[in-house]
From Swiss-Prot:
GO BP terms: negative regulation of BMP signaling pathway; negative regulation of transcription by RNA polymerase II; negative regulation of transforming growth factor beta receptor signaling pathway
UniProt cross-references to InterPro entries, sorted A to Z: c-SKI_SMAD4-bd_dom, DHD_Ski, DNA-bd_dom_put_sf, SAND-like_dom_sf, SKI/SNO/DAC, Ski_DNA-bd_sf, Tscrpt_reg_SKI_SnoN
Source taxonomy: Eukaryota, Metazoa, Chordata, Craniata, Vertebrata
Name used for this protein in its record: Ski oncogene
Tissues/organs with expression: High levels of the protein are found in the lungs and ovary with intermediate levels of expression in the heart, spleen and brain. Low expression levels are found in the liver, kidney, testis, intestine and blood while no expression is found in muscle, skin, stomach, eyes or nerves.
Gene: ski
């Protein structure tokens, strides 16, 4: 387990100067806010006030500062691919958490929240506010495509921070302007844009995006989105979460804003001190503002935060009768490293801070040094263990994308395992709170400490320490006051040797070293010093030598049990590390399989799309061909109809002419037959006449009757 003492680390002068320069430059850069602004703003406020309160000092012997190689190391930017969602103007937007700041998908914002605005308007506002749009990585682009947020044909995607998205939406959708009757020196009579002065109204302000002052009207705060704050510049009413974005000054357009969220307006709106009668009135308005902030706080975040702040005491001053006197060199050294101690206490101390200490309301909180009401236990393992967790919290405070090179050597100062119970007034007020109280078994004289050898820092342990520190801490908690005498590298064989050694009777002080938890346990040389302190306790509290030996044997047994517990905890830690590594490998494998499946799916979709386009092209060509054939058939049909009528007309005309000719021939034949009949009638009449003449001749010739009959028959024939 890593044992890095927060108080023993002494910063190099060049490193401290580099950190101060980084703090000044990071306010206007894209790397995030200054993570080291807490102590810097406190020193600035103390210099302005002209008084320097006493700082809490851990009473440790002086030692030379370690060698710090080089300056800051700028590491690669955070390329996180874990997709999450956030709410922006009532719309759910996909985002990635990069460097602690949410990066929102810009195309999704344009298509949902800002769909009523043109690209020219959006670009103009982005140029005015200096909104920076970064390009997403290839993995982030693939995730957005797989989730269906972006089309597969999208070549890239822009990402903007949640803070810039809030500023952009506020400027486009809720941008206030100066009404014609809101000038500071106006000669117009009072109108509807006057201040909403009521009995409970009071002035507030915020320091976000250039600052703004307003008048809070509690009577109008009927629901979370009620416009209850009136801007003192434009006289327009805004709800609290919109007032913190509202501003009429372009003072911070070139500042990198980081970590802003309008949902946290309760932390941004502050009470204005001008126009307040006295301290009582100021306290009353402060309580009223706190009550208003707790109203409609459904998640109870602000209530929990306020309760946590009120439960911790304010920093106490050291009493004048302090019996411990520090040398000028140690005081100077503690003063130079005070900024590091305060940084490690940020997660534990959150006392009251004067508003002048904060340059902006949404920048990291600058806590004052608060005193701990618990008793201080100076036992080294517990101190190192708590310092280790504070060191881990200190690592998380570094600004995103920027890391500092760790020192090559870090030293830990040992302390006696048992110290006499001292009054609270003589304890250090700035000591980190322990996990539990420990009662010393006997009154012991204070033994001077000796510097410890350097402790190596293993990079492989730093990587996985964050994931399992909670489990390791639960398994490694000590269950009694005597159990705090154990060390990670103690063994039963060495303890037996020390018990049988006659040199135990001589009071000696041995240097001890505490190593970082690793795969190979090393023997510790601090057993002699601890047993010497135990002998002093036995000499002062036990009479017989047998009782002392029995007490020492009990202590050794207890330490062996604790070592077994520690080994079991280390084994559990290793197993958890292996399981975590297995989960990481499995996650990478699943991600690779998902990526491969996505690529195959995309290829299949592209193939189906190509086939569909080909079939659609063929269908369109077939449709056009059939359409042309249909038109040709229609034209042919129309032509055929016209030609057939002509042919029928010609045919019928020919037939009519033929019939007419036939009729003419028939008429001619009829005339010819009529003529023939006339000729035949005439011939018949002539014949009848001849016959009649012959009959007459026959009648006249009666004598020749047979011959005449025969002649008549011949004539008839």
């Amino acid at each position: 387990m890593e044992t890095v003492s927060r108080s023993s680390f002494q910063p190099h002068a060049g490193l401290q100067k580099t950190l101060e320069q980084f703090h000044l430059s990071s306010m206007s850069s894209l790397g995030g806010p200054a993570a080291f602004s807490a102590r810097w703003t406190q020193d600035l406020y103390k210099k302005e006030c002209g008084k320097e309160p006493p700082e809490p000092i851990l009473h440790l012997p002086s030692q030379p500062p370690p060698v710090i190689p080089g300056g800051p190391l700028f590491m690669p930017s955070d390329r996180s691919t874990e997709r999450c969602e956030t709410i922006l103007e009532g719309e759910t937007i996909s985002c990635f958490v990069v460097g602690g700041e949410k990066r929102l998908c810009l195309p999704q914002i344009l298509n949902s929240v800002l769909r009523d605005f043109s690209l020219q308007q959006i670009n103009a506002v982005c140029d005015e506010l200096h909104v920076y749009c970064s390009r997403c990585t290839a993995d982030q682009l693939e995730i957005l495509k797989v989730m269906g947020i972006l089309p597969f044909s999208a070549p890239s995607c822009g990402l903007i921070t949640k803070t810039d998205a809030e500023r952009l939406c506020n400027a486009l959708m809720y941008g206030g302007s100066y009404p014609p009757r809101c000038a500071k020196k106006s000669d117009f009579p009072p109108g509807p844009l006057e201040l909403e002065l009521t009995e409970g109204s009071f002035k507030v302000y915020h320091e976000c995006f250039g600052k703004c002052r307003g008048l809070f009207v509690p009577e109008l705060y009927g629901h979370p989105s009620a416009p209850c704050i009136q801007c003192l510049d434009c006289r327009l009413m805004y709800p609290p979460h919109k007032f913190v974005v509202h501003s009429h000054k372009a003072l911070e357009n070139r500042t990198c804003h980081w970590g802003f969220d309008s949902a946290n307006w309760r932390a941004y709106i502050l009470l204005a001190r001008d126009g307040v009668g006295g301290d009582d009135e100021l306290a009353r308005l402060g309580r009223l503002l706190e009550e208003i902030k707790e109203k409609f706080d459904y998640s109870n975040k602000y209530k929990r935060k306020a309760a946590r702040l009120s439960s911790e005491p304010v920093a106490k001053k050291a009493k004048a009768d302090d019996s411990i006197i520090h040398s000028p060199s140690s005081a100077e050294k503690d003063k130079s490293s005070s900024w590091l101690r305060n940084l490690s206490n940020i997660n534990k101390n959150a006392g009251y801070v004067h508003p002048r200490q904060r340059l902006s309301a949404f920048r990291p909180w600058s806590p004052a040094i608060s005193a701990n009401d618990k008793e201080l236990s100076t036992h080294l393992p517990a101190l190192i263990r708590d310092s280790f967790y504070n060191y881990k919290s200190f690592e998380n405070l570094v600004a995103p994308n920027v890391a500092l090179t760790p020192p090559v050597q870090q030293k830990v100062i040992t302390s006696p395992p048992c110290v006499p119970a001292v009054p609270r007034s003589t304890q250090s007020s700035g000591s980190p709170p322990q996990s539990r109280k420990r009662r010393p078994t006997a009154e012991l004289p204070i033994v001077p400490e000796a510097p410890a050898p350097p402790v190596p820092i293993r990079e492989e342990e730093k990587e996985s320490e964050t994931e399992i520190e909670v489990e390791s801490r639960e398994e490694c908690t000590f269950t009694s006051s005597l159990s705090s005498l154990s060390s990670p590298s103690f063994t039963s064989s060495s303890s037996a040797k020390e018990l049988s050694s006659p040199g135990m009777l001589a009071p000696t002080v041995i240097n001890t070293s505490y190593e970082v938890a690793s795969h190979n346990d090393q023997h510790c040389s601090g057993l002699e010093a601890e047993l010497e302190h135990l002998k002093q306790a036995l000499d002062s509290g036990l009479d017989s030598k047998e009782a002392k030996e029995k007490f020492l044997h009990e202590v050794v047994k207890m330490r062996v049990k604790q070592e077994e517990k520690l080994n079991a905890a280390l084994q559990a830690k290793r197993s958890l590390q292996q399981e975590l590594e297995f989960l990481r490998v499995a996650k990478k494998e699943k991600l690779r399989e998902a990526t491969e499946a996505k690529r195959n799916l995309r290829k299949e979709i592209e193939r189906l799309r190509a086939e569909h386009e080909k079939k659609m092209k063929e269908a369109n060509e077939s449709r056009l061909r059939l359409k042309r054939e249909l038109e040709q058939a229609r034209q042919i049909r129309v032509c055929d109809k016209g030609c057939e009528a002509g042919r029928i007309r010609v045919k019928y005309s020919a037939q009519i002419e033929e019939l007419q000719s036939k009729l003419q021939h028939a008429e001619n034949d009829r005339e010819q037959l009529r003529t023939d009949l006339v000729h035949e009638r005439e011939a018949r009449e002539h014949l009848e006449k001849v016959v009649k003449d012959l009959q007459e001749q026959l009648w006249s010739k009666t004598s020749h009757l047979p011959s005449s009959e025969h002649t008549r028959k011949d004539i008839e024939n």
